[in-house]
Structures are given as C-alpha cells and as structure tokens.
Amino acid sequence: MSMQIKRYPTLDLADNPIKLRLLPKESLLTLCDELRQFLLTSVSGSSGHFASGLGTVELTVALHYVYNTPFDNVIWDVGHQAYPHKILTGRRECIATIRQRNGLHPFPWREESEYDILSVGHSSTSISAGLGMAVAATYEGIGRKTVCVIGDGAMTAGMAFEALNHAGDIKSDLLVILNDNKMSISRNVGALNNHLAQILSGKLYLRINESSKKALHGMPYLKELAKRTKEQIKNIIVPNCTLFEELGFNYIGPVDGHDVQGMVHILKNMRCMKGPQLLHIITQKGRGYAPAEKDPTTWHAVPKFDPAIGQLPYQNISNYPTYSDVFGDWLCNAATSNKKLIAITPAMREGSGMAKFANQFPQQYFDVAIAEQHAVTFAAGLAISGYKPVVAIYSTFLQRAYDQVIHDVAIQKLPVLFAIDRGGVVGADGQTHQGAFDLSYLRCVPNMVIMTPSDENECRLMLHTGYHYNNGPSAVRYPRGNGIGVEYSLLRILPLGKAIVCRQGTKIAILNFGTLLTQAKKVAKTFDATLVDMRFVKPLDIELINQLAISHQALVTLEENAVIGGAGSGVNEYLMRQRLLVPVLNIGLPDYFIPQGSQEEIRAELKLDSDGIMEQIKQWLAR
C-alpha cells in the first residue's frame, strides 16, 4: 500500500490528525475524495466492513480536523464505520491487514491505538462510556471534550436511551452525533437546515440565549413562557428535536453529513457549547460507490472483490448449506403447519438465515431492532399467551439478555426456543464476537435444555425437539459455517438427555459436544477410542457417562466453548458427585479472549483441529 499512496497526494499529507489539522480547510473536499477512493481500493483487496465507512468519510475528517484528538475523546459506536478513522490515525499502511490474524483489529481497540479511546464491537455502548469520560473531564478541569458517534440503528437499543436520559439529567459537556444513514428519522435535509444548524450552534445565538436566561431569572412565569415559545418555534422548523430536547439535550440538525466544510463549521461552534448536545447528521451508507449505495446491506461486510465489476463474488465455496440456512429452512417448514410459531430476531435477519421466512411469513416475523433484552421478554409474553416463540440470536449477543433469560423465561418455565447462531469460534470479528461462553452461562440456569448438534441433520432434529418441548426453555447452539453433507432424516423428537455412541473403542472415551465430531472421529481412530456424540449439554446422559467411567481408563471431553464452566465441567461435576475416580481431560476454548483470524487459523492455534486434539491427548497421557 505504501507504493500506492502517491496516487493520493492530499491523503499522503494527512497520515495522522496532527498533520491533518495543518491542511487548509479548502483541501478537505479533496482529502475526502481521496480517502473514500483509498478505502475502496483497500477493502476490495483485503475484505472487511465497507459500506458504513464510505458513509462516514466527511464526518471522520471533520472530527479530527476540529477536535484535538487524542487529547479529546472521540468514540465510535460498534465500530463498523471506523475504517476511515483508522486510516487517518497512523494505521494507513496496515489497513490491508484488518480482520486478519495478527493484523489490525476489525473495530476500534484500545490496545491498538491511543486514538481508540474505547474498545467496541457490540452496539450502543458509546454514550454510556462517553458520559463517564465527560464526567471525568469535568473533574480534571483541563478542557477535554468528548464526542460519541452513534448510528440510527444503534440508537434503537435501550442502553443508548438510558445513557441519554442520564446525560440530560446531569448536564455534563457531551456531544452525541447521531449518524442517520437510513433516512429513518427525518428527511428534512438541505440548505435551510444546514443554515439553521449553523445559527443554533453559533456564538451570537448562544450569547443571546444565555443573556435571556439571566434576564428572566427570578421571573418564573415569563421564563417558562419564553422557553415554550422557543421550543415551539424550533419544533416548527426542526420537528425531530422534541424527544432529545425532552431528554435534556440541545438538538441541532438534521444536517448534511457529506458537507465536510459545513460539518467543520458546525463542529467548531459545538465544541464551545456547554451541556449535553445532540447533532443529527444525515449520511448515505455506501456513499461514493454506486453498488453499495443501491444495496448497503449486501455491501455492509464484503470479501475481496473487483471494484470495476461492482458485484460480490459468490462466497459459499461449499456445496453444503450453512447452519444459518439450515435453521431458516427448518423455520419455514415448521411455520407452514403452525400459525402460532413466531420468529424473533434482534436486527440479524440476514445473518441468522431468516430473510426467506420474513418474506414468506411476515405476520409471524418480528425484527425488534438492536434490543436483545426486549426480544427475550417479548418472547416470554408470547409464550404466556399460548404462542411458540423462536428467538434467533448470535451467541455473543445473547449475553446482553442474560437476566431476561433467567428472570422472564426460565423461572417461569416458558417454552421459548433459542436458536443460538455463531456458537464457538466465529473468526474475523475478534474478541467481541466469538461465541465462547454460551454453554457456560446457560448450563447453570435451572429448567434449561441445551443441545449441541454435530451436523446439519442433527441441527434440524434438535430444533424440532426444542420447538416441541413444553416444560421450559430450550436452546440449540450451532456454529458459523457449513454443514458436512449428511443426508436429512425425517424429523422426530429426540429423547432428552440421550447420547449416541459413534465408535466403540478401548481405554479412552471421547465425549464430544457439537460440530468438532468430524475432527474427533480421526482422533478416536488413532487412539482406538470410544467416541460419543453427547448431543445434550443439559440434561447430560448420566447413565452413559457412568458406564464410560467404569469401563474406560480415561475420559476426554471436547467442545468449542470455554473450558471453564462448559459442557466438560458438567461431566466433571457429575463424576465427583458420584465419586467416580477416572482421569478427565477437558478440551475447549482457553481462558482468554480470542482475537481475530480465520476459523481455520484459530482452531489450529488453539489445537482444536484433529492434529491439535491428538497432540493435547498425547501430552496428557504422557504425564
């Protein structure tokens, strides 16, 4: 990439924000054009999040031009839109390594750069963290400013409004920039709104506003009348401000987020303003690349592609369906015979394989937005009313609704089926997205049934079993990736807590939970070991475990979940309760957060491929 930078002469001068701030304001438009083209060239050659970054080029340039980063705090919610930020903060030469093993982190990451003040990956955390930093800045008294950039999608989460409510109450100096890239909040964009924003953020308006407050001090009736008059006039011109004003924020906008010089002008004014401020900008996701502008969802995260062609290559190199597709097909088939099936997702329709269901059964489908807590309790209400809710959710996002799983579903023994996608090693999105903990945090919940399919057919059978289980909640946990090509059998309800012996061996028994069964078969053959597809993490097949402990010299548990508290821990606990003294090796994910890389790279490094599993067992037996 260093050889190519000469094609971008203005960007070449802005390797970091200090150099960026030396550029004349007139050159910022050229800088934005070059930055957008550089981003297109880079991501198309390496893969990564794409459309969001194209939409925040002007905002990123304006923020680093106006604010004294890294002294001032700029926080990016989620982080999909932060590639331009990384490029402008000294990481331009490494941007092609993003999301790769030992490369740049896919999201802003504190360990990577002093400009990344908050590590992110999950949605809607920016305002809470930003408010904490703003309060700390008040204590410091050194003039540090804090800015939070949050998208209109992330603003749908309850946590964002909790933070807005608190910020409006305590009145700390905080700027929240609402990056509205769906036109979902307002279409009032244009010269009038941009001009109004400049007036409302200008020093003259602020002086008049403050002077009027002082003049009316001690005259509460006139003060309240003036306040209402100002709000009514403002709401006529800017109809969206009411909600944020009621929360205690001074609302400005909406303004054109692609007018970099206008943004610089407004941000310079707002940097001097006191109290909580909300700037509403309108941007276009995928800006500057026509295919991404037309279909920003498809171009949200992309593999390598040829920009000249304008089409993404077909990614599924396997002939077998993904587990998400297996779930989606099962869901559609189940809904044809049951009108009380209700499918729920927290803003992951495509990722969870639900697009076809949403189109075929719109009355039985609910996308509740980025609101995992609400999704689970919404499902509880449906279950109480006699419906059969299925919550499709990524493992890493179910963490956000843990109290609701316990308090609103499990305690009441409600028949909610959790279809947990992306269990285990997920890959390129790194620490925040690995599905490492679900078996551990669900296994301790009373009344919960937990199933781990070893292949796509077993996934279907377990979804069918969970759907027809009426004595409490159930969970089917499956990985990101493709099946292995097994034939489908007729759907049937599996006996609860019963495993299958896949291979009878001697001395060692391998108890496998999930899709590592393919690797385990090779290992079992090498050691002449008994191999068991455990199927159920809860309830365990304790009768079979009893037999294996008595008839074998050692047991090995295998899972793609944290070893601490996982399925293997459940086996250990049972053996100890029964005072069955047999050596057990628990193989799974280690006690640290797993960084980004391909699934194959990570499994090899963690010794969860067949060679690595054999090595772990050999070393253990040799002790």
UniProtKB/Swiss-Prot annotation:
Pathway(s): Metabolic intermediate biosynthesis; 1-deoxy-D-xylulose 5-phosphate biosynthesis; 1-deoxy-D-xylulose 5-phosphate from D-glyceraldehyde 3-phosphate and pyruvate: step 1/1
Keywords in alphabetical order: Isoprene biosynthesis, Magnesium, Metal-binding, Thiamine biosynthesis, Thiamine pyrophosphate, Transferase
UniProt KW Metal-binding keyword: yes
InterPro entries according to UniProt: Dxylulose-5-P_synthase (IPR005477), THDP-binding (IPR029061), Transketo_C/PFOR_II (IPR009014), Transketolase-like_Pyr-bd (IPR005475), Transketolase_BS (IPR020826), Transketolase_C (IPR033248), Transketolase_CS (IPR049557)
GO biological process: 1-deoxy-D-xylulose 5-phosphate biosynthetic process; isopentenyl diphosphate biosynthetic process, methylerythritol 4-phosphate pathway; terpenoid biosynthetic process; thiamine biosynthetic process
Cofactor names: Mg(2+); thiamine diphosphate
Top-level taxonomic group: Bacteria
Residues given in the record as thiamine diphosphate binding sites: H80, G121, H122, S123, G153, A154, N181, Y289, E372
Known EC number: 2.2.1.7
GO molecular function: 1-deoxy-D-xylulose-5-phosphate synthase activity; magnesium ion binding; thiamine pyrophosphate binding
Cofactor note: Binds 1 Mg(2+) ion per subunit. Binds 1 thiamine pyrophosphate per subunit.
Top-level enzyme category: transferase
Listed GO CC annotations: cytosol
Catalytic activity reported: D-glyceraldehyde 3-phosphate + pyruvate + H(+) = 1-deoxy-D-xylulose 5-phosphate + CO2
Binding-site residues for Mg(2+), renumbered to this chain: D152, N181
Function statement: Catalyzes the acyloin condensation reaction between C atoms 2 and 3 of pyruvate and glyceraldehyde 3-phosphate to yield 1-deoxy-D-xylulose-5-phosphate (DXP).
HAMAP family in the cross-refs: DXP_synth
Assembly and interaction partners: Homodimer.
Family classification: Belongs to the transketolase family. DXPS subfamily.
Protein name from the UniProt record: 1-deoxy-D-xylulose-5-phosphate synthase
Taxon lineage: Bacteria, Pseudomonadati, Pseudomonadota, Gammaproteobacteria, Candidatus Palibaumannia
